[in-house]
Amino acid sequence: MEIKSVKVLFFNEIKKNPNHPLKVLVSDHDAFKCIFDKIYLERLSNIIQQPCAYSQMKKGNGDPIKINFPEPTGININMMPIVLGMDNIEYLNPYFNIIDLCVRQQLGVEGAWEKYDKGKWIGYITIQESIVEPGETQRRPGLHIESPLGKGRLVPQPNYKEVGCDAYHNSEWKSIAWGTGRWYGTHHADGIYMASNTENSTKLYPYLVENSEKVTDTHGGLEEFRKDLTGEIMKKDTMYWFTDKTPHESLPNLTDKPVYRQFFRLVVGPIGVWYSQHNTPNPLGVQPEAQIINNNKFN
């Protein structure tokens, strides 16, 4: 919950109870500010600056690997489950080399080759090819991490069963996996890959969020901490890897003309939930390895 929301609740509680022992804080602005500043800093301490929060995909000589985006066809899919290296969905074939580039970076991880070789490695692909109008963002705006919060049976392990929102009840808020991600210096394990064919469209922040239930909103939002975080704008046609606890944001089109953007994201690590109202089913019948939630995640 944001500090400003806590302040509103505090003042409302004081109004309901004129004899509240903390009523003195309403008139003592310095003490009031001191308390909430301390709360803010305590929450901010869970956002740890880490160079391993994201990285560019690079060649052996250290140069960034450039991505050759295919001719656009208007694809618009979100978190579609695919068998990495195996699925043969015709309209995704032009993106095969980009997908393969990401997967091969993971094959040094223990157990990855076996999953890949046996066709048991499920990833989640997002491709959006669309016009972005001036002042608009193509993807989700606002500073956030991919890992949301959930309750009940959603954590710590998925039960691979379709459930409704009642699964959220009767438990504390906890972080849900949305790709996880670890960096070992020479290779990545799990995580998320992202690229775009336009400049100034996404910003990544070199931090990892710990104890996200103390910091983010239920959708991973971090907007209230923006003033204390600095980031890097992604370069176009360049693949980036990051974790589901890495802050990032989609940026608006700041030109005076519409731009046609191709956005690519591949989640190669485990996820805890898959939202049927927001995500794209696989036409070949591949199922997500996660709890399937049939309700709107924003309700």
Predicted regions and their residues:
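Exposed regions on extracellular, virion, or secretory-pathway luminal proteins
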Residues: 2, 19, 135-140, 230, ...
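Catalytic core of non-heme Fe(II) oxygenases with the double-stranded beta-helix
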Residues: 136-235, 274-277
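A generic structural signal for short, non-catalytic loop/turn and secondary-structure boundary residues
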Residues: 1, 17, 120, 136, ...
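Short His-Asn-centered micro-motif
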Residues: 128, 143, 195-197, 242-245, ...
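N-terminal auxiliary "cap/dimerization" subdomain that precedes the catalytic jelly-roll/cupin core
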Residues: 1-120
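Intrinsically disordered, low-complexity cationic segments
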Residues: 19, 28, 143, 218, ...
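Catalytic core of Fe(II)/2-oxoglutarate
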Residues: 220-299
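Hydrophobic alpha-helical segments and helix pairs
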Residues: 91-170
